């Protein structure tokens, strides 16, 4: 039997009919967005209940300090200047609503506050205040109920952490008192040999120079965005290479205490320390890299450095660290997710802060901020463990997600990985990309993630050891059985090398239930993701589908793919999101990769979904069972003109025009709900689309493939048959039924060609991007329209059998009988039952009811718990 314990089913069992009548079946959201680029609500929300972790108080910035930040790297000069030294806040909290008894009050310079001790159980009242001209302007009184679910995450206070920081150096990558023991225990580990092998090569490799940055293509670029992006990439090519080389030398010294590694590393760091002053060095990642090298050299070589070298390094650390702190504070703690800070730069400032704590006065502030903002906002954006930026950019956060909490754990002895987010994140990491399989197809650059890379496997390896998760352990074992040196591929990878962690952590991979004990599907309602499988044991026989309808919309690295699905067989994509991520706001990337026309969803009057948090969807209902699964996505509010100030600025700076000609305009859409029913582990899914508008509109159903063209068969007038192929023995056959006649088209051309002006190899050769394949089925104009689609994903060697339409109008497919209302009249509805097992699903325009083995689950809409 599949393990269903871990699946958080947001459903309501039909036990109490009185209570059931009180909850509306449908919730129609009217908010312009579910999330915000910058916080607009306090946390915890008024009336909230917190039972899984300590309470961190957070609130919006004052209006005069609110900012979306720089639209992109290189445009920081466009951000309004804020004198952060004038920002001040107060907070008070008590179990007395009048704040007269037992009131705790504090001053803070940031818009959040973590109590030094976890709040006791019960009802608490709290207020925050903006301090202006010395006078506090108090908020309304807010209330929070504190409970304990038995696994409450309550980490130590900053005061307790700082008491554990050693006075000696090194203290970050290794603690001096543990150094000799660490060196001895590393002798039998392969990671030690890897680092020494790389370091020995570096010793005989000439160092690159900042003058080697290639600027030859600048003359061919058309706007400042392209110039900044190109120089950022080319300067990172030099600086990242030298970071890897120098980091290998530092780690080799820590492993051996051999001066040859230290002397060469010190020489290189002293040369690189001011490379940020070169006009061709662009981007905050380069600044952070240089801070990392300076601070790790200072800490690791402390006993070898001269007084002059220490002073020079401390001066560099002060300059770069202050620049980062001044950017972060009173900004990132309120921001939905400042990409680069979350990915790497907060980690780097954190390590620099602890490396220089006690040696630099500024480090007192940095440690305070870095530790407390971690407690308040990190490690994840929400509780469900999903990552809204998608499959490719998730791995850029790897070192941050492991190294920062592992350092705090080593310092204090408190298990920072007991944060429940990590348990949920294992499920995201597994379900969105099973072993040896293509990624789920979400987020910028997902096209490049052909199988779980070595960084992702290293991350699962770390979480398996740290949390005892046996599913992650099985995933890792299966991968390393195929390639025992697979983890070496991540050695010194900037965002994701965890070889040093494995040298430090002696916990073994745990034994226990493996992937075959997992359920067929998993849903992340806060992130807005779902995926289902048919075979955890043999990827070659696995039919998978993924789905997204997300409150995060299409901001950051997320895509405008609300209510979109992808299909896979044998780990290869079939019906799959199209387009190429050339650059964050490149015209092709925006119109043909981020934009809605690139995805397996719906266009309304030819228009796509908004760019930004305003183009959102959500998952009101879902069910994961042994014999049936179900997800309902709602993208009713996703469409319209782009109105995000941040994305309008980005478009302006990148020559991206949000016009009707390019696919953005107001539309009369009032409802777009997509139901997907997973028909057991047969490889069949049923999709039912409810579309309504305030005036007649046309609706375009889209499918895309990225490896081979689709075939379209309209022989049977009752449906359109579209077949997509993986090119590796897999197929998805889609049978599209609809309210009326459809006008179809196929093309192998992008709306805007994929022109690579950015990504050249070391020899200056620019990679060519292939075209993809696109199918559209456009309806006549109507106020109400419905699509019903059956998709069978299978091995090509076992050809699909067309659905059988019975005399009474029911459809028979894959051992299931389907009744569906495709007419514009009457309530939207479907009824599906298995011909083999006692399982069915019913929808008649209100509740969704699943009957599985005699247990009835009635689902009504539930809004996911969100903040920001």
Q: Can you annotate each of these PLM segments?
A:
Residues 26, 144-174, 712-713:
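Low-complexity, Pro/Ser/Thr- and charge-rich linker/hinge segments at domain boundaries
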Residues 356, 396-574, 780-786, 803-868:
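Carbohydrate-active enzyme catalytic cores, enriched for enzymes
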Residues 195, 227-438, 445:
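Aromatic-lined, polymer-binding surfaces characteristic
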Residues 133-149:
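Extracellular fibronectin type III
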Residues 23-75:
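Pro/Thr/Ser/Gly-rich low-complexity, intrinsically disordered linker/stalk tracts
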Residues 69, 73-121:
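Recognizes extended acidic, P/S/T-rich segments that occur
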Residues 581-868:
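CBM-like, beta-strand-rich accessory domains located in the C-terminal region of large
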């Amino acid at each position: 039997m599949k393990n269903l314990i871990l699946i958080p089913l947001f459903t309501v069992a039909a036990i109490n009919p009185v209570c059931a009548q009180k909850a509306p079946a449908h919730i129609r959201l009217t908010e312009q967005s579910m999330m915000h680029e910058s916080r607009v609500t306090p946390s915890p929300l008024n009336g909230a209940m917190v039972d899984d972790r300590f309470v961190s108080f957070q609130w919006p910035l004052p209006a005069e300090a609110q900012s979306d930040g720089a639209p992109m790297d290189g445009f920081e000069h466009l951000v309004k200047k804020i004198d952060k030294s004038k920002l001040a806040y107060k907070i008070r909290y008590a179990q007395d609503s009048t704040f007269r008894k037992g009131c705790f009050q504090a001053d803070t310079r940031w818009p959040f506050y973590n109590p030094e001790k976890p709040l006791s159980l019960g009802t608490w009242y709290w207020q925050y205040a903006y301090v202006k001209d010395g006078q506090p302007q108090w908020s309304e009184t807010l209330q929070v109920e504190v409970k304990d679910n038995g696994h409450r995450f309550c980490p130590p206070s900053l005061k307790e952490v700082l008491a554990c920081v050693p006075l000696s150096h090194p203290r970050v990558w290794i603690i001096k008192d543990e150094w000799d023991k660490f060196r001895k225990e590393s002798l039998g580990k392969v990671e030690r040999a890897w680092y020494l092998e790389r370091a020995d090569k570096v010793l005989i490799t000439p160092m690159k120079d900042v003058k080697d940055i290639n600027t030859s293509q600048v003359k061919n670029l058309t706007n400042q965005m392209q110039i900044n992006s190109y120089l950022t990439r080319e300067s990172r090519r030099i600086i990242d290479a030298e970071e890897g080389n120098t980091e290998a030398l530092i780690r080799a010294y820590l492993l051996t205490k051999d001066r040859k590694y230290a002397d060469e590393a010190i020489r290189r760091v002293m040369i690189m320390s001011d490379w940020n002053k070169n006009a061709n060095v662009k981007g905050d990642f380069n600044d952070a890299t240089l801070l990392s090298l300076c601070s790790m050299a200072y800490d690791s070589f402390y006993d070898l450095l001269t007084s002059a070298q220490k002073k020079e390094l401390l001066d560099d650390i002060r300059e770069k660290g202050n620049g980062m702190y001044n950017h972060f504070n009173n900004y990132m703690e309120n921001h939905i997710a400042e990409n680069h800070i979350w990915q790497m730069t907060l980690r780097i400032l954190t390590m620099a802060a602890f490396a220089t704590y006690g040696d630099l006065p500024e480090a007192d502030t940095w440690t305070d901020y870095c530790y407390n903002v971690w407690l308040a906002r990190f490690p994840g954006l929400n509780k469900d463990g999903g990552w809204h930026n998608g499959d490719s950019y998730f791995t850029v956060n790897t070192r941050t997600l492991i190294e920062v909490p592992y350092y705090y754990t080593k310092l204090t002895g408190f298990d920072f990985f007991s944060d429940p987010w990590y348990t949920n994140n294992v499920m995201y990491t597994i379900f969105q990309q099973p072993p040896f399989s293509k990624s789920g197809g979400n987020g910028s650059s997902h096209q490049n993630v052909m199988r779980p890379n070595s960084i992702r496997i290293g991350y699962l390896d770390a979480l398996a050891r740290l949390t005892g998760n046996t599913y992650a352990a099985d995933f890792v074992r299966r991968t390393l059985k195929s390639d025992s040196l697979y983890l070496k591929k991540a050695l010194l990878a900037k965002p994701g090398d965890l070889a040093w962690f494995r040298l430090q952590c002696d916990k073994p991979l745990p034994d226990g239930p493996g992937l075959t004990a997992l359920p067929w599907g998993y849903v992340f309602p806060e992130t807005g993701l779902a995926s289902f499988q048919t075979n955890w044991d043999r990827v070659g026989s696995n039919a998978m589908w993924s789905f997204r309808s997300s409150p995060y919309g299409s901001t950051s690295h997320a895509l405008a793919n609300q209510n979109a699905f992808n299909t896979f067989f044998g780990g290869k994509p079939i019906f799959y999101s199209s387009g190429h991520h050339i650059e964050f706001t490149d015209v092709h990337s925006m119109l043909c990769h981020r934009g809605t026309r690139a995805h397996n969803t719906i266009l309304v009057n030819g228009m796509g979904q908004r760019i930004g948090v305003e183009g959102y969807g959500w998952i009101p209902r879902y069910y994961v069972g042994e014999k049936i699964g179900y997800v309902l996505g709602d993208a009713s509010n996703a469409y319209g003109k782009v109105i995000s100030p941040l994305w309008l600025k980005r478009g302006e700076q990148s020559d991206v025009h949000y016009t009707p000609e390019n696919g953005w305009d107001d539309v009369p859409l009032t409802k777009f709900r997509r139901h997907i029913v997973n028909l057991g582990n047969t490889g069949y899914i049923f999709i039912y689309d409810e579309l309504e508008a305030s005036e007649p509109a046309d609706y375009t159903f889209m499918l895309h493939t990225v490896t081979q063209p689709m075939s379209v068969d309209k022989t049977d007038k009752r449906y359109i048959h579209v077949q997509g192929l993986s090119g590796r023995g897999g197929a998805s056959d889609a049978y599209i039924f609809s309210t009326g006649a459809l006008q179809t088209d196929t093309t192998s051309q992008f709306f805007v060609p994929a022109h690579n002006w950015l990504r050249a190899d070391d020899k200056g050769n620019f990679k060519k991007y292939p075209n993809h394949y696109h199918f559209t089925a456009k309806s006549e104009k109507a106020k109400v329209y419905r699509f019903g689609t059956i998709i069978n994903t299978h091995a090509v060697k076992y050809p699909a059998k067309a659905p059988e339409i019975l005399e009474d109008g029911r459809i028979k497919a894959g051992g299931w009988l389907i009744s569906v209302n495709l007419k514009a009249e009457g309530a939207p509805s479907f009824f599906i039952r298995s011909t083999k097992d006692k399982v069915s699903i019913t929808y008649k325009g209100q509740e969704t009811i699943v009957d599985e083995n005699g247990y009835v689950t009635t689902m009504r809409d539930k809004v996911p718990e969100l903040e920001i």
